[in-house]
Amino acid sequence: MKIEAVIFDWAGTTVDYGCFAPLEVFMEIFHKRGVAITAEEARKPMGLLKIDHVRALTEMPRIASEWNRVFRQLPTEADIQEMYEEFEEILFAILPRYASPINGVKEVIASLRERGIKIGSTTGYTREMMDIVAKEAALQGYKPDFLVTPDDVPAGRPYPWMCYKNAMELGVYPMNHMIKVGDTVSDMKEGRNAGMWTVGVILGSSELGLTEEEVENMDSVELREKIEVVRNRFVENGAHFTIETMQELESVMEHIEKQELIIS
């Protein structure tokens, strides 16, 4: 079997180490309404279409209970729409600062292309958001062959439609000749639902939620424990393989090809 294409996520996988751009904004739009949410809660739905992310936060029992305490009712769809509009406005202003390629990504992409591998991408950002991120990332040397946003298909993650559209545009089939790489639970589900080899990247991921400085300065035992928690979470949600950094991706690809593995 030959791997012919790799489909990458964006924030937390190829750009924006730790996926911090949306995090503070999600927390802020709730805080403004007197409803405090934690960073851990804000990260949990990461990877979904952003309005679905806001909706998922309002459906978390603790957050819903706190909202009910403040407003004497549960969040309505109008509340969700209002918060999402605020989210977009704030995020658009800061996105250019969070589009730098993660260290090692450009080199891995160049190596994959030398092998004739096509590079696709999916995201939880809207097309308008990605117009900002993709433009800035390209200026810094990262530009996949194709990009699909949830706006381009009937539904975003965990549905497989973005991966299918990548496959069609890149001209690659069957789906087990492709690898999906991401940093969230929804990425793992997207890849598995699409019938692709699915790989979770840990360092720089939203699931780990650490800055580069925090990773460098953290006690090695504590860091290892956190890495293993994320690794297990990825596997429990469908990852065939996990890697700590993007530099390990090619060895995973070679393993798949040499072993003639079958997706299960």
From Swiss-Prot:
This is Phosphonoacetaldehyde hydrolase. Gene3D superfamilies: HAD superfamily/HAD-like, Putative phosphatase, domain 2. The keyword DNA-binding does not apply. It catalyses: phosphonoacetaldehyde + H2O = acetaldehyde + phosphate + H(+). Its EC number is 3.11.1.1. Changing G47 to P/V: Loss of enzymatic activity. Homodimer. One of its GO terms (cellular component) is cytosol. Involved in phosphonate degradation.
